[in-house]
């Protein structure tokens, strides 16, 4: 009975793990967040963004980057999906 469960359930769980890893990678792309930080800085420097908006966005992006770094550290050694 357990052998049949292993044969039927393990591939499904493995697929879910891969999909979960891919979703986390996509949601927490550190390079994309860094680009957004640079864009925010540039918009502020050329005067298209107020200092208040700049500071708020900067805090949001830095928090997102910190979260992404934490998630990536936790995901080390897990399944690596190559694109």
Swiss-Prot record:
It is found in: Gas vesicle. Its main location: other. The keyword Aminoacyl-tRNA synthetase does not apply. Encoded in a 14-gene locus called mc-vac. Belongs to the gas vesicle GvpG family. Proteins GvpF to GvpM might be involved in nucleating gas vesicle formation. A minor component of the gas vesicle. Gas vesicles are hollow, gas filled proteinaceous nanostructures found in some microorganisms. They allow positioning of halobacteria at the optimal depth for growth in the poorly aerated, shallow brine pools of their habitat. This is Gas vesicle protein G. It comes from Haloferax mediterranei (strain ATCC 33500 / DSM 1411 / JCM 8866 / NBRC 14739 / NCIMB 2177 / R-4). The lineage of its organism: Archaea, Methanobacteriati, Methanobacteriota, Stenosarchaea group, Halobacteria.
């Amino acid at each position: 009975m357990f052998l049949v469960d292993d044969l039927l359930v393990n591939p499904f769980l493995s697929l879910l793990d891969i999909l979960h890893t891919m979703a986390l990678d996509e949601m927490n792309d550190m390079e994309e967040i860094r680009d957004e930080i640079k864009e925010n800085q540039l918009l502020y420097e050329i005067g298209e963004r107020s200092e208040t908006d700049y500071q708020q966005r900067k805090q949001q992006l830095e928090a997102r980057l910190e979260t992404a770094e934490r998630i990536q550290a936790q995901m080390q050694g897990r399944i690596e999906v190559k694109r």
